[in-house]
């Protein structure tokens, strides 16, 4: 059945080619290092490599600590990290220095085989259950152990995978480990054809996050805050199209009562920096941008556009309130754990299905606030800026919940260590699960 899958994949890629070409005309990201997507990689020095795959920025940051621990526990093994998006590559190359970073190959036999011959992995760890049937089969044929880590199967993904379950079942049954975030994810993995003996609930790696402190940036900002007279800060992280207008309208009302407040606006995708800048220019609000901080500074009662990558997380340390983007627009929400790490009160909209279980836990612990509209957003931000007790208690509850959920990294390491000690898997020979 993989021949049919390959035909459908090729047809889909052909259909998307005009879109990718248009994007590449603007950014050059799709043809730059395009050979990597065809599996053209320099041969890796050393034996028994560990290959970690993470699609985008969120997944790459989730495995950051795991990669560091793998390097410490298995110092003789080369480490590589493959990604799918250009933004993930940029962030990973800057933050995850223990691994060589490259683009994941297209899921054709020729490209996956070529990449596997170059890397020669003993172990492949795939973050968040991204299922590429051809790669999974070729990796097992090459003798690599394959484990899904931080596994998550959303309701939408589960419905899609069930349509192609006959195609997937034989391959998925031979995966060496399914280390899932929740029992719901584990049950869905078993339903899709995973060997029940190899399915475990290990928790969410994102709870083990260690965001960069970036003290130099914070010192710089503190100086600008003092100079501008900023007294309170709202950080809106990973915003999506349609949300900036809502945030600006809410902030426009808030600044009438909090004239020394500052809104830090961080769009999710770099390609939206300029459209958001144009929106700010037309808003009538005072604003400036990160890339021009030395010339433009920061303005109290205004907006600061974070047009950079890798600097959002440490800004939550100075936040009096943190809005999680992708949740008012219907995108499923983004990471609410980074603001929680810095004890910032968390606010999000109704569309949090990508983090549904975590969002509900935060709401139950009174560590977050859910809003349904711009008016509700303005109301809760007003409460957080004016009520010190509410703001501090919500932030402390968020941090406490985060700390109570740590430990997934250690559980993943305990599972994969016996696999690395075992002989190679051989051609599609199922490995026995590690003993508890």
Predicted segments — roles?
Residues 1-436:
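Nucleotide-activated sugar donor-binding and catalytic core shared by glycosyltransferases
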């Amino acid at each position: 059945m993989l021949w049919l899958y390959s035909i459908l994949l090729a047809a889909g890629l052909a259909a998307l080619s005009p879109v990718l070409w248009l994007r590449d005309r603007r950014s050059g990201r799709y043809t730059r290092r395009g050979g990597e997507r065809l599996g053209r990689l320099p041969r890796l020095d050393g034996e028994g490599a560990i290959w970690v795959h993470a699609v985008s920025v969120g997944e790459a940051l989730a495995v950051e600590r795991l990669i560091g621990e793998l390097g410490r526990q298995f110092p003789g093994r080369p480490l590589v990290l493959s990604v799918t998006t250009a933004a993930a590559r940029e962030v990973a190359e800057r933050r995850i220095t223990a691994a060589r970073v490259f683009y994941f190959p297209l899921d054709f036999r020729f490209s996956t085989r070529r990449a596997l011959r170059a890397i020669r992995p003993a172990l492949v760890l795939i973050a968040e259950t991204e299922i590429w049937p051809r790669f999974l089969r070729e990796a097992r044929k090459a003798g690599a152990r394959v484990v899904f880590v931080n596994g998550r199967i959303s309701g939408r993904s589960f419905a899609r995978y069930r349509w192609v379950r006959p195609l997937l079942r034989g391959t998925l049954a031979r995966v060496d480990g399914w280390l899932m975030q929740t029992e719901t994810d584990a049950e869905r993995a078993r339903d899709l054809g995973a060997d029940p003996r190899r399915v475990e609930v290990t928790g969410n790696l994102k709870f083990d996050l260690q965001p960069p402190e970036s003290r130099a940036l914070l010192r710089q900002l503190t100086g600008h805050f003092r100079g501008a007279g900023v007294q309170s800060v709202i950080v809106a992280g990973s915003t999506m199209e349609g949300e900036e207008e809502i945030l600006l309208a809410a902030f426009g009302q808030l600044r009438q009562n909090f004239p020394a407040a500052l809104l830090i606006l961080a769009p999710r995708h770099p390609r939206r920096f300029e459209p958001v800048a144009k929106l700010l220019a037309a808003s009538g609000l005072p604003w400036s941008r990160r890339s021009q901080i030395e010339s433009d500074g920061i303005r109290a009662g205004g907006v600061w556009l974070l047009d950079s990558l890798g600097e959002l997380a440490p800004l939550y340390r100075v936040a009096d309130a943190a809005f999680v983007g992708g949740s008012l627009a219907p995108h499923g929400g983004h990471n609410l754990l980074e603001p929680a790490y810095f004890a910032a009160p968390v606010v999000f909209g109704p569309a949090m299905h990508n983090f549904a279980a975590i969002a509900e836990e935060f709401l139950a612990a009174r560590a977050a606030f859910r809003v349904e509209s711009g008016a509700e957003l303005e109301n809760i931000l007003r409460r957080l800026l004016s009520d010190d007790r509410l703001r501090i208690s919500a932030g402390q509850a968020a941090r406490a919940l985060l700390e109570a959920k740590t430990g997934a990294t250690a559980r993943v390491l305990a599972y994969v260590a016996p696999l690395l000690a075992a002989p190679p898997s051989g051609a599609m020979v199922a490995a026995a699960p590690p003993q508890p």
